[in-house]
Amino acid sequence: MKFELDTTDGRARRGRLIFDRGTVETPAFMPVGTYGTVKGMTPEEVRATGADILLGNTFHLWLRPGEEIMRKHGDLHDFMNWQRPILTDSGGFQVFSLGDIRKITEEGVHFRSPINGEKIFLDPEKSMQIQDSLGSDVVMIFDECTPYPATHDEARKSMQMSLRWAKRSRDEFDRLENPNSLFGIIQGGVFEDLRDESVKGLLDIGFDGYAVGGLAVGEPKADMHRILEHVCPQIPADKPRYLMGVGKPEDLVEGVRRGVDMFDCVMPTRNARNGHLFTSEGVIKIRNARHRDDTATLDPKCDCYTCKNYSRAYLYHLDRCNEILGARLNTIHNLRYYQMLMEGLRGAIETGTLDAFVKEFYTSFGREVPELIV
């Protein structure tokens, strides 16, 4: 992977990630394909929304279908027929989400399979091996996602173990002679001194890119913004910056303003299945009865297949009847909305008009622009 930085506007960055399987324009949003599919979508449909790269889930793909079946197909690209870049998370966040059915030790994590209750062990070495079998273009280190709230001491212990796991991930990745890219994950909760220690430790190990983890786990938005403003300038300018698991459209805007290059989130797809649709004027809840006879399109500014062909009344009807097509059309729209937002942000950075773009974005929702600390 090669990262090219073209231009900046304030702290916002316009660039691209160049892989053997294709180029990803940044800032970029990655749709989430947890089980090797963006729910309800074919790869061609996902690509048509403007997506350059997908995120796959190491933890779930390890449990089903497993490494053996994956290797029989070649890798995840061949298995799901997506011949463009794929980033896979390490499984750390999913283990974090298991709560009481997992036990974290220095060696790794013991837990019971959420599928059949089988006892399973996952550690940094195994995570690297699984991601190697997936053929991931971007591999994420195995880390512990620091919970929120956490005391300074709890966050420190978690972050320092993640640093030790980062070194083990790096060593195993190198032992496997994996030709792809490995990203480190910055932890430390909401504590700036711990984030500093994490950044320094990861830079000493050396990675191809750096993610900011442990955010969007319940902390106030002000804390997320503060940590991003503190951490992003410490990441070398020639390395991509990835904000994991984020988020709402305004979170992407605020992340870009603070220098983030990459995002992922299940929100556009999950919300689509629940009838929450993002538009240039705010969220439309298509299940609201007011849309029963509404002949308007979802968003006159959107060029997606759904907006070009169907009315709000039709989408309301499909949802009321629990038709699969409704969820698919909603997903196409939400994914395209996110990609159009990223296209707009990239264009604004290129032309030096990001402030105006951000102001218009918030004005359309009747909201004030959040202040940057610096």
Curated annotation (Swiss-Prot):
The keyword Magnesium does not apply. Substrate binds at residues 89-93, 143, 187, 214. GO terms for molecular function: metal ion binding; tRNA-guanosine(34) queuine transglycosylase activity. Its cofactor is Zn(2+). Pathway: tRNA modification; tRNA-queuosine biosynthesis. One of its GO terms (biological process) is tRNA-guanine transglycosylation. Binds 1 zinc ion per subunit. GO terms for cellular component: cytosol. Keywords: Glycosyltransferase, Metal-binding, Queuosine biosynthesis, Transferase, tRNA processing, Zinc. It catalyses: 7-aminomethyl-7-carbaguanine + guanosine(34) in tRNA = 7-aminomethyl-7-carbaguanosine(34) in tRNA + guanine. It comes from the Bacteria. Catalyzes the base-exchange of a guanine (G) residue with the queuine precursor 7-aminomethyl-7-deazaguanine (PreQ1) at position 34 (anticodon wobble position) in tRNAs with GU(N) anticodons (tRNA-Asp, -Asn, -His and -Tyr). Catalysis occurs through a double-displacement mechanism. The nucleophile active site attacks the C1' of nucleotide 34 to detach the guanine base from the RNA, forming a covalent enzyme-RNA intermediate. The proton acceptor active site deprotonates the incoming PreQ1, allowing a nucleophilic attack on the C1' of the ribose to form the product. Homodimer. Within each dimer, one monomer is responsible for RNA recognition and catalysis, while the other monomer binds to the replacement base PreQ1. This is Queuine tRNA-ribosyltransferase. It comes from Shewanella frigidimarina (strain NCIMB 400). The lineage of its organism: Bacteria, Pseudomonadati, Pseudomonadota, Gammaproteobacteria, Alteromonadales. The gene is tgt.
